[in-house]
Amino acid sequence: MSSYLEYVSCSSSGGVGGDVLSLAPKFCRSDARPVALQPAFPLGNGDGAFVSCLPLAAARPSPSPPAAPARPSVPPPAAPQYAQCTLEGAYEPGAAPAAAAGGADYGFLGSGPAYDFPGVLGRAADDGGSHVHYATSAVFSGGGSFLLSGQVDYAAFGEPGPFPACLKASADGHPGAFQTASPAPGTYPKSVSPASGLPAAFSTFEWMKVKRNASKKGKLAEYGAASPSSAIRTNFSTKQLTELEKEFHFNKYLTRARRIEIANCLHLNDTQVKIWFQNRRMKQKKREREGLLATAIPVAPLQLPLSGTTPTKFIKNPGSPSQSQEPS
């Protein structure tokens, strides 16, 4: 929502020439509480312009301005919480035609230290050098807040709000000056993030991000090594093991056709049967090696000759090669 100022010419109403600067109702509070604004200096002999803020319940500004508004003596508040703001209007006699023709420019002049933005967006008119300057900013009174930008009071929450854009458009369609005021470095208050005030105990540590039951292959993948998906161990049933052992008893090696047939009968896949036979052959070779070592250990002492005895001599009989005779 862009903020704007409504400029109404009242030179033909009531026979009193002048201009009226009013604020749209959307910039005011929801209740019908008027805001009294004090002009910075006398506004002339009745032919000058005056600055007013409409009541919040009014939809359109009053077409007839007062003849000569007197300067009210309003004492300033004792200790305002925020910086006060004044709406200043300056009008030089004889410049009413130029203002009505759209030759006057408007500008925002900041006065508060917190949310002010320096910059004068006023430019002298081409005819006679007459110009009008308006200084606006947020008005914070004791009873509530009066925001020209139409936004929420972000200062109360500790968060900065968006700056209003300065827009000027003349009533008769003549092009006007348009410029957006940007804050100077250092004048904008530092934003207070709610997450910045949290202690370090609420932050996420590195050990919280690591999986507790990470496998060794997963750890190798963290250091750059490729970790293939580990195969799940197959739990064979008793019937499956019996059939596989029976087939292994007859055939240590299976053809591909026989392997596929067994896999279909036992509700397994080809790879599971292949791996089982590989492991079974390795187990068989291991058992054979252990059996040879177990039989070779007790036979070795019997082959050594006994002390004090002569070795036995076998004499072959040509008639009966299988019989042997001992010497007498």
Curated annotation (Swiss-Prot):
<comment type="similarity">
    <text>Belongs to the Antp homeobox family. Labial subfamily.</text>
</comment>
<keyword id="KW-0371">Homeobox</keyword>
<dbReference type="GO" id="GO:0006357">
    <property type="term" value="P:regulation of transcription by RNA polymerase II"/>
</dbReference>
<keyword id="KW-0539">Nucleus</keyword>
<keyword id="KW-0217">Developmental protein</keyword>
<dbReference type="GO" id="GO:0005634">
    <property type="term" value="C:nucleus"/>
</dbReference>
<dbReference type="GO" id="GO:0048706">
    <property type="term" value="P:embryonic skeletal system development"/>
</dbReference>
<dbReference type="InterPro" id="IPR001356">
    <property type="entry name" value="HD"/>
</dbReference>
<feature type="DNA-binding region" description="Homeobox">
    <location>
        <begin position="229"/>
        <end position="288"/>
    </location>
</feature>
<keyword id="KW-0805">Transcription regulation</keyword>
<dbReference type="InterPro" id="IPR020479">
    <property type="entry name" value="HD_metazoa"/>
</dbReference>
<feature type="region of interest" description="Disordered">
    <location>
        <begin position="305"/>
        <end position="328"/>
    </location>
</feature>
<keyword id="KW-0238">DNA-binding</keyword>
<dbReference type="GO" id="GO:0000785">
    <property type="term" value="C:chromatin"/>
</dbReference>
<dbReference type="GO" id="GO:1990837">
    <property type="term" value="F:sequence-specific double-stranded DNA binding"/>
</dbReference>
<dbReference type="Pfam" id="PF00046">
    <property type="entry name" value="Homeodomain"/>
</dbReference>
<dbReference type="InterPro" id="IPR009057">
    <property type="entry name" value="Homeodomain-like_sf"/>
</dbReference>
<dbReference type="InterPro" id="IPR017970">
    <property type="entry name" value="Homeobox_CS"/>
</dbReference>
<dbReference type="GO" id="GO:0005654">
    <property type="term" value="C:nucleoplasm"/>
</dbReference>
<dbReference type="GO" id="GO:0000981">
    <property type="term" value="F:DNA-binding transcription factor activity, RNA polymerase II-specific"/>
</dbReference>
<comment type="function">
    <text>Sequence-specific transcription factor which is part of a developmental regulatory system that provides cells with specific positional identities on the anterior-posterior axis. Acts on the anterior body structures.</text>
</comment>
<dbReference type="GO" id="GO:0030182">
    <property type="term" value="P:neuron differentiation"/>
</dbReference>
<dbReference type="InterPro" id="IPR046327">
    <property type="entry name" value="HXA1/B1/D1"/>
</dbReference>
<dbReference type="GO" id="GO:0019233">
    <property type="term" value="P:sensory perception of pain"/>
</dbReference>
<dbReference type="GO" id="GO:0000978">
    <property type="term" value="F:RNA polymerase II cis-regulatory region sequence-specific DNA binding"/>
</dbReference>
<feature type="compositionally biased region" description="Polar residues">
    <location>
        <begin position="319"/>
        <end position="328"/>
    </location>
</feature>
<keyword id="KW-0804">Transcription</keyword>
<feature type="short sequence motif" description="Antp-type hexapeptide">
    <location>
        <begin position="204"/>
        <end position="209"/>
    </location>
</feature>
<protein>
    <recommendedName>
        <fullName>Homeobox protein Hox-D1</fullName>
    </recommendedName>
</protein>
